[in-house]
Regions:
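A short glycine-rich, His/Asp/Glu-containing loop-to-beta-strand
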Residues: 1-22, 28
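Short, surface-exposed charged micro-motifs
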Residues: 11, 31, 76
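Short loop/turn positions at the edges of beta-strands in beta-sheet-rich folds
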Residues: 16, 26, 35, 71-73, ...
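Short beta-strand His + acidic residue motifs that chelate non-heme Fe in jelly-roll/DSBH
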Residues: 21-23, 41-43, 67-69, 75-80, ...
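Glycine- and acidic-residue-biased ligand/ion/polar-headgroup-sensing regions
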Residues: 27-47
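Short acidic-glycine-tyrosine-enriched beta hairpin
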Residues: 45-75
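Double-stranded beta-helix
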Residues: 49-51, 78-129
Length: 129
């Protein structure tokens, strides 16, 4: 019988502007270690209100390059540049432990994503004031 992995690790590449629907992982924290590029990690409450944002950049930039998302917390990223990062979370991977935010459009709802991202950018500006 195959051994289940205790840690789920990935090196991920996303192009600037890639949309990932906000989601949470039940019973799991998640960490991001930025390798190259620039991205904002966003934390939301259960209703989709933006609570916190952290801008990540390469180590050499002096920006934060690591962020750990708390357990069962809705989150998303805004990719400011083409970005490569290392992501780690508790394994094994289980698609059923990921809950997508009902208040955010699916990746395939292109006509809604543009307006959602515009609104999110407005919330982000207010939060960072």
């Amino acid at each position: 019988m195959p051994r289940k992995n205790d840690v789920h690790e990935m090196v991920i590449y996303h192009k600037k502007g890639t949309y990932i629907r906000p989601h949470k992982h039940l019973g799991k924290t998640e960490s991001f270690l930025l390798i190259s590029g620039e991205a904002d990690v966003l934390i939301f409450d259960e209703d989709g209100n933006l609570l916190k944002a952290r801008n990540l950049g390469k180590y050499e930039t002096g920006k934060n390059y690591y962020y750990r998302i708390p357990d069962s917390c809705f989150h998303a990223q805004i990719f400011r540049k083409d970005t490569i990062f290392h992501e780690a979370t508790k394994g094994p991977f289980d698609v059923n432990s990921t809950i997508n935010a009902i208040w955010a459009p699916k990746e395939t709802e292109y006509h809604l994503v543009k307006d959602y991202m515009k609104n999110l950018e407005s919330q982000l500006k207010l939060l960072l004031k």
